[in-house]
Amino acid sequence: MIMKLAEKFEELKNKGEKAFVAFYVGGDPNLEISEKALEVICKHADIVEIGIPFSDPVADGITIQKADVRALNSGMNPLKAFELAKKLNEKAPNVPKVFLTYYNIIFKMGEEEFVKKCKEAGVSGIIVPDLPIEEADSLYNYCKKYGVDLIFLVAPTTPDERLKKILEKCSGFVYVVSVTGITGAREKVAEETKELIKRVKKFSKIPACVGFGISKREHVEEITEIADGAIVGSAIVKIVEKHLDENGQIKDEEKFLKELEEFVKNLKEGTKKKAKVAIKN
């Protein structure tokens, strides 16, 4: 049985842990390597977010933009992403998989078809960073129909009224943007992020996971004192970048996977250390 996001958060709560959500672009630098990398990530992450590469990823920083280009150049496409998720679910059904995708990809396939394929591949949720809440009704209804969580992003600039609307439609977890702007690895967790988590907790019981700019274990420890999970993306993708040769392929697969595993394992440990700290509603 493939684990749902709500079940995962319940399991973590019972263990006294917070969620470590790891992001990786499907097909980076090619499908075979990305599958191996994601298998390694699944050993330590609680939830895995798979990016479906897109030619114009507006919410992503340069690191993920480059990863999208590499993946697209290797022939990655949405149908292969479904296959990838399916394979990973056969090996790690207890680690929920979430797609991060831009609306154009969903629109091209057709909303219902896309959500149905998510269900068939065992994808637990979808994040669509460029879909505003005002235009999400149709996709939201298909997600409800097929039992797939629709995860929205909220930012420090999101006013309370809008925040309430988003939280009403959001399921699985809410993606708390730690800084306004684009993704990337930053040095310190901002105070406004902490304020935003408090606001989310005031309006909803949905788990709040913080992403955009989390790159170190210290960040994970700090953020999981107040949030239900930490999302790490660019810092993981940078490991891919570091191991590329001049042709854009992995130089030494073994070394790459070893460094990747050590990094994600260490980040997961950061969600255990502060897990006993209660979240103040």
Curated annotation (Swiss-Prot):
One of its GO terms (molecular function) is tryptophan synthase activity. The active site is at 49 (proton acceptor), 60 (proton acceptor). Keywords: Amino-acid biosynthesis, Aromatic amino acid biosynthesis, Lyase, Tryptophan biosynthesis. InterPro entries: Aldolase_TIM (IPR013785), RibuloseP-bd_barrel (IPR011060), Trp_synthase_alpha_AS (IPR018204), Trp_synthase_suA (IPR002028). CDD domains: Tryptophan_synthase_alpha. Pathway: Amino-acid biosynthesis; L-tryptophan biosynthesis; L-tryptophan from chorismate: step 5/5. It catalyses: (1S,2R)-1-C-(indol-3-yl)glycerol 3-phosphate + L-serine = D-glyceraldehyde 3-phosphate + L-tryptophan + H2O. Its EC number is 4.2.1.20. Gene3D superfamilies: Aldolase class I (3.20.20.70). GO terms for cellular component: cytosol. GO terms for biological process: L-tryptophan biosynthetic process. Disulfide bonds: none annotated. Belongs to the TrpA family. The alpha subunit is responsible for the aldol cleavage of indoleglycerol phosphate to indole and glyceraldehyde 3-phosphate. Tetramer of two alpha and two beta chains. This is Tryptophan synthase alpha chain. It comes from Methanocaldococcus jannaschii (strain ATCC 43067 / DSM 2661 / JAL-1 / JCM 10045 / NBRC 100440) (Methanococcus jannaschii). The lineage of its organism: Archaea, Methanobacteriati, Methanobacteriota, Methanomada group, Methanococci.
